[in-house]
Amino acid sequence: MARLVGVDLPRDKRMEIALTYIYGVGRTRSNEILAATGIDRNLRTRDLTDDQLTHLRDYIEANLKIEGDLRREVQADIRRKIEIGCYQGLRHRRGLPVRGQRTKTNARTRKGPKRTIAGKKKAR
């Protein structure tokens, strides 16, 4: 199993897909990385040479913010929004959807399970 920037890449997948196992790398960025390093995107991970693996590692470390660094940056951005008290920060603080989704119905993932209200009856 090839290990790249702290992530084990699956052996049997094509490189285009295998690179998406790294946090911060999707399909588009994966194809950009492979084009820049000159590696065929249909090549399987198990078929990579040590030289290609080293070239990939060097390119990713030099040009991309991924994994732990990216996670820390996202968390810092959220903390900053909460501290300055902007609308998005308030939504984060209250545990509600941040990007304008409706909350009268739905939004259960963000709001958690329904809480019953004592004394409230259904209207017929």
From Swiss-Prot:
GO terms for molecular function: rRNA binding; structural constituent of ribosome; tRNA binding. Residues 95-124 are annotated as: Disordered. One of its GO terms (cellular component) is small ribosomal subunit. SUPFAM superfamilies: S13-like H2TH domain. GO terms for biological process: translation. InterPro entries: Rbsml_uS13_C, Ribosomal_uS13, Ribosomal_uS13-like_H2TH, Ribosomal_uS13_bac-type, Ribosomal_uS13_CS. Keywords: Ribonucleoprotein, Ribosomal protein, RNA-binding, rRNA-binding, tRNA-binding. Pfam families: Ribosomal_S13. Located at the top of the head of the 30S subunit, it contacts several helices of the 16S rRNA. In the 70S ribosome it contacts the 23S rRNA (bridge B1a) and protein L5 of the 50S subunit (bridge B1b), connecting the 2 subunits; these bridges are implicated in subunit movement. Contacts the tRNAs in the A and P-sites. Part of the 30S ribosomal subunit. Forms a loose heterodimer with protein S19. Forms two bridges to the 50S subunit in the 70S ribosome. Belongs to the universal ribosomal protein uS13 family. This is Small ribosomal subunit protein uS13. It comes from Mycobacterium marinum (strain ATCC BAA-535 / M). The gene is rpsM.
